[in-house]
Amino acid sequence: MSRIDRNDVYKLQPTLVTALTNLGDAAGQVIEAPLVHLLHLRISQLNGCAFCQHMHAAEARRDGEQQQRLDVLAAWQETGFFSARERAALRWAEALTLLPSQQLSDTVYNELITQFSQQEIVNLSAIIVTMNAWNRIALGFQFQSSLMAD
């Protein structure tokens, strides 16, 4: 039996795709699009999902993100390219994505609450959970982008 491909995943369980898409879209209405792009890309980097990295970097560029910031996103803590709000969100994304290998510290949460409302924190968390789910689906079924298939 051959591996289930991306289109088959969508056909075999459309409710899953719809649920993940709806959750991500709803949370993304509360959080600004440039930050959502950064989170999607950073989480995909952490999870090693080339398909998602390729897709979300292209989306970010299409929506006006600077290539310079995308180039250093994996080392965001070492640069001055990201705002305090972006840094807090990226740190939160890393903490939630890397569970259980690292504990959530009060420092990370305290930084987060200085930059985001409670509603925004819940929505950030939903974005992070959703992207992690997509990464695991894409990695599990070895999704390939058209550029990577060559």
Enumerate the language-model features and the residues they cover.
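Hydrophobic alpha-helical segments
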Residues: 1-150
